[in-house]
Amino acid sequence: MTHDNIDILVVDDDISHCTILQALLRGWGYNVALANSGRQALEQVRERVFDLVLCDVRMAEMDGIATLKEIKALNPAIPVLIMTAYSSVETAVEALKTGALDYLIKPLDFDNLQATLEKALAHTHIIDAETPAVTASQFGMVGKSPAMQHLLSEIALVAPSEATVLIHGDSGTGKELVARAIHASSARSEKPLVTLNCAALNESLLESELFGHEKGAFTGADKRREGRFVEADGGTLFLDEIGDISPMMLVRLLRAIQEREVQRVGSNQTISVDVRLIAATHRDLAAEVNAGRFRQDLYYRLNVVAIEVPSLRQRREDIPLLAGHFLQRFAERNRKAVKGFTPQAMDLLIHYDWPGNIRELENAVERAVVLLTGEYISERELPLAIASTPIPLAQSLDIQPLVEVEKEVILAALEKTGGNKTEAARQLGITRKTLLAKLSR
């Protein structure tokens, strides 16, 4: 089973234990989120979809059993594994009765943990397989964010209809994938999906590509050619970057859409076509109409149903999934045993603004895999623009108690000094006694 699209939430008020588990699970290829209390865990479960929760029993304020009950109330399908340092039968039985899938004894045996995780996830996979559902990954789209779920819902609603669809989104967001998903989910799925990038061709070539031409219609036309409209007959025609078409071509395109018929270049014969049209653009066509650069009548013909594809900045929570997806692909292609990303590298990917969106992320991961000499991609393998991304000190709006922040800083100092408490205290500007006291809180 591949792990690049699996999200695990670790819930434990022991920050050092959380950090160790995070590093371990990321090393196994999982995406990991942390919660240092039951309340934090519930907030995250409300905001995101997790494949599995790993929760400690003994926590202050809200214990693991209470957290388990609340998680199951929010989402009964999430498998929860309980961790306990107390191997009492009563605790295990109570956890299982409350809805836990299994329990683990602390200190954790890592081999047992890995086996239990795979068993729990395999159990979930079997349950999901028995309930067929349309998912983004079926169409090459990866993500679990609210923005992606909204996009999938729109695709599911639009696909069964015959309505013309206008897809808008920045370059590199995956507009063609949306078009393919609509076609694959429609009644026309057994017929052709024909695609054409309108921005890549000049006016004369675009006319020939769309409508076809007769032999001898122009220099180099040594044989008759059917156009994309005819090739897509019975199926779907996807016109990418339609906002780049010239005014003259817009007139011909409008006529073809209205009359549902085309003429090859150099011919007077009309050919009836049955085509569903999906168009895409990165331009604001309403503004183009107001500026006189795009025909209003064609805009209304195209804009029957509008779908907005979110930029990568609008779905940052999907970046670990996408990065893992591309990592697996390029590791296999380049025959490299890459285990994952370092936490620092993943933080950089998440906080970078991605002007080129998914296409830029894909290129960055491919480059990193090619340059990698070790097992984990670090900031050294990332392009300079990404590696120099500033990471905000506060990465969420949640304000942690000061004692937790202090402990995190101390743990970081200890890691930097190789566990030397005296040196860590010196670098932090406190006494060794104060450091030990703060660690024991």
Curated annotation (Swiss-Prot):
Q: Which Pfam families match?
A: HTH_8, Response_reg, Sigma54_activat
Modification 4-aspartylphosphate occurs at: D56
Q: Name one GO cellular component term.
A: cytoplasm
InterPro entries noted in UniProt: AAA+_ATPase, CheY-like_superfamily, Homeodomain-like_sf, HTH_Fis, P-loop_NTPase, Sig_transdc_resp-reg_receiver, Sigma_54_int, Sigma_54_int_dom_ATP-bd_1
Q: Where is the Sigma-54 factor interaction domain?
A: 141-370
Q: How is its activity regulated?
A: Activity of the ZraS/ZraR two-component system is repressed by the zinc-bound form of ZraP, which probably interacts with the periplasmic region of ZraS.
Q: How is it modified after translation?
A: Phosphorylated by ZraS.
Domain (Response regulatory): give its ranges: 7-121
Q: What is the role of this chain?
A: Part of the Zra signaling pathway, an envelope stress response (ESR) system composed of the periplasmic accessory protein ZraP, the histidine kinase ZraS and the transcriptional regulator ZraR. The ZraPSR system contributes to antibiotic resistance and is important for membrane integrity in the presence of membrane-targeting biocides. ZraR is a member of the two-component regulatory system ZraS/ZraR. When activated by ZraS, acts in conjunction with sigma-54 to regulate the expression of zraP in the presence of high Zn(2+) or Pb(2+) concentrations.
Protein's name in the database? Transcriptional regulatory protein ZraR
Native organism: Escherichia coli O157:H7
